[in-house]
């Protein structure tokens, strides 16, 4: 694989890659070294106005393109993403820190997502409703909602853009994304594939800059008709409130803190392999990452020992280095957060079984950590750690574990391990989550719904349900005269 040199990132406005009107830029830092590797354009109001005007004109053009032609263009983009997967993955690892193997999987998965949405967009149908008056015709028509404003996080720079972008394009909407300024190059490479595939100017736009300034300007703007956001629950609530104030549709994919219930009859080796792998993927910086491990007391010690062994078997290092299985945390803020989690765990009497400390002084490396005997009042059992920390607590009855899993206001994802169909039935009925994986790691395929309940948001970014928020349903009745 040829090495890819990291370059500066520009804005995408009206089909052109441009600097900010002010010339302002922001440093991009490699989390594995702590050193700047490039710069990204910092959009101001003048840039946003240009991007909004382009999104409006792009929408008027794109909505007129037949669904099968939109799908063909999207498939061309998917093919280009696959061709460029190695290069895009290297950009991602340099700016985000995850191992190159994980970055490449993310990019290749993006191509699958594009193709699935391209095909699903061809199946957006209206319907004919039998009239009560035989002289009338009643039809239901689906139309694109309009220009979309998207706001995406740094933990999955490509995946979190492509889900929103694909749903928007498949339904005939234009799309303007404020992507993360900490990880700008890989989202730009994704959008470049769409430009090169022939998506018309203005249909897609890309800006970076101050999150509060950009969101407070885009969401109320009359051009924008749909808002979609992935990020923390507190910020999501603010953006959802702003969208509601201006009657904009919104999809919110927010914080998780996923429970993992390991029942008495579980296959411990399977549970450790599946949940452990999911826990330390992307250094735990995953909204659906398993975080609260609720393990039956009869197997708790066995499970803890096995998870510690799994964690200690990970190779921590620069994501570009061969064999690395756990990369740097994305930014210094995560190091501070991890230190706080560990300090609190010790203070309340939990046991640090492995890890619990920063590795080295260069880069944002933190040891994979397992905490046992965690009290319910520990921070790690109440606030999403968003890092490589697994917290374990025992239980005696499955109903107790379910109650604890549901105790928090979050409800994005959940995991369970059991051989009993009765347990599966109970877990399926009782766990308050939008996504549940039993006896396996997370598999968020594009054809399955992806979203949460309670404070974890609303709306879906997968399955046929993902297209509905981008569509307007129009009722048309015509009387023959």
UniProtKB/Swiss-Prot annotation:
Record EC number: 1.2.1.26, 1.2.1.24
Stimuli inducing this protein: Induced by L-arabinose, and to a lesser extent by D-glucose or a nutrient-rich medium.
Binding-site positions, NADP(+): 154-155, 178-181, 231-232, 254, 384
GO terms classed as biological process: gamma-aminobutyric acid catabolic process; L-arabinose catabolic process to 2-oxoglutarate; protein tetramerization
Keywords linked to the UniProt accession: Arabinose catabolism, Carbohydrate metabolism, NAD, NADP, Oxidoreductase
Active-site feature positions: 253 (proton acceptor), 287 (nucleophile)
One Gene Ontology term of the molecular function aspect: NADP+ binding
Disruption phenotype: Cells lacking this gene are unable to grow on L-arabinose as a sole carbon source but grow on a nutrient-rich medium or D-glucose at the same growth rate as the wild-type strain. Moreover, both the wild-type and the mutant strains can grow on D-glucarate or D-galactarate as a sole carbon source.
Pfam families, sorted: Aldedh (PF00171)
Catalytic activity: 2,5-dioxopentanoate + NADP(+) + H2O = 2-oxoglutarate + NADPH + 2 H(+); 2,5-dioxopentanoate + NAD(+) + H2O = 2-oxoglutarate + NADH + 2 H(+); succinate semialdehyde + NAD(+) + H2O = succinate + NADH + 2 H(+)
Enzyme's top EC category: oxidoreductase
Family matches, as Gene3D superfamilies: Aldehyde Dehydrogenase, Chain A, domain 1, Aldehyde Dehydrogenase, Chain A, domain 2
Subunit structure and binding partners: Homotetramer.
Function: Catalyzes the NAD(P)(+)-dependent oxidation of alpha-ketoglutaric semialdehyde (alphaKGSA) to alpha-ketoglutarate. Is involved in a degradation pathway of L-arabinose that allows A.brasilense to grow on L-arabinose as a sole carbon source. Prefers NAD(+) to NADP(+) as a cosubstrate. Displays broad substrate specificity: exhibits the highest activity with alphaKGSA and succinic semialdehyde as substrates, but to a lesser extent, is also active with glutaraldehyde, benzaldehyde, and a number of aldehydes from C3 to C8.
Family from the record: Belongs to the aldehyde dehydrogenase family.
Misc. comment: A.brasilense possesses two isozymes of alphaKGSA dehydrogenase with essential physiological roles for the L-arabinose and D-glucarate/D-galactarate metabolisms, respectively. The L-arabinose isozyme was isolated in PubMed:16835232 and is described in this entry. The other NAD(+)-preferring isozyme of alphaKGSA dehydrogenase is induced dramatically by D-glucarate or D-galactarate but not by L-arabinose.
Name of the protein this chain belongs to: Alpha-ketoglutaric semialdehyde dehydrogenase 1
Source organism: Azospirillum brasilense
């Amino acid at each position: 694989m040829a090495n890819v040199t990291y370059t500066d990132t520009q804005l995408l406005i009206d089909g052109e890659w441009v600097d900010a009107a002010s010339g302002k830029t922001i440093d991009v830092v490699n989390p594995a070294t702590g050193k700047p590797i490039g710069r990204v354009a910092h959009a101001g109001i003048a840039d946003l106005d240009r991007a909004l005007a382009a999104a409006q004109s792009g929408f008027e053009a794109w909505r007129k393109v037949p669904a099968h032609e939109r799908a063909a263009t999207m498939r061309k983009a998917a093919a280009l993403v696959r061709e460029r997967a190695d290069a895009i993955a290297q950009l991602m690892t340099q700016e985000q820190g995850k191992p190159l193997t994980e970055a490449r999987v993310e990019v290749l998965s993006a191509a699958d997502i594009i193709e699935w949405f391209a095909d699903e967009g061809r199946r957006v149908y209206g319907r004919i409703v039998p009239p009560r008056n035989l002289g009338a015709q009643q039809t239901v028509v689906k139309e694109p909602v309009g220009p979309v404003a998207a706001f995406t996080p740094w933990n999955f720079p490509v995946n979190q853009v492509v889900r929103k972008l694909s749903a928007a394009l498949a339904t005939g909407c234009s799309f303007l994304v404020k992507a993360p300024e900490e990880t700008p190059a890989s989202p730009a490479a994704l959008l470049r594939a769409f430009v090169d595939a022939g998506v018309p100017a203005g249909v897609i736009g890309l800006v970076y800059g101050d999150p509060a300034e950009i969101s407070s300007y885009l969401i109320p703007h009359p051009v924008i008709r749909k808002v979609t956001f992935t990020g923390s629950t507190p910020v999501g609530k603010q953006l959802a409130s702003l969208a509601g104030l201006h009657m904009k549709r919104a999809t919110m994919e927010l914080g998780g803190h996923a429970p993992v219930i390991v029942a008495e009859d579980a296959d411990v080796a399977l549970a450790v392999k599946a949940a452990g792998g999911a826990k330390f993927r992307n250094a735990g910086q995953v909204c659906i990452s398993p975080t609260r491990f609720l393990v039956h007391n009869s197997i708790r010690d066995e499970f803890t020992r096995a998870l510690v062994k799994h964690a200690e078997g990970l190779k921590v290092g620069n994501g570009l280095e061969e064999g690395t299985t756990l990369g740097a945390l994305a930014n210094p803020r995560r190091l501070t957060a991890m230190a706080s989690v560990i300090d609190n765990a010790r203070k309340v009497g939990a046991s640090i079984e492995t890890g619990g400390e920063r590795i080295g002084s260069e880069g944002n490396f933190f040891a994979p950590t397992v905490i046992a005997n965690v009290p319910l009042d520990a921070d790690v059992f109440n606030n999403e750690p968003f890092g490589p920390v697994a917290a374990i607590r025992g239980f005696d009855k499955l109903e107790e574990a379910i109650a604890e899993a549901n105790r928090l206001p979050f409800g994005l994802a959940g995991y369970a391990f059991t051989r009993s169909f009765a347990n599966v039935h109970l877990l399926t009925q009782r766990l308050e989550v939008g996504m549940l994986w039993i006896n396996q790691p997370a598999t968020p395929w594009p054809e399955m719904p992806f979203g949460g309940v309670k404070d974890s948001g609303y709306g879906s970014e997968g399955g046929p349900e993902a297209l509905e928020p981008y569509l307007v349903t129009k009722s048309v009745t015509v009387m023959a005269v």
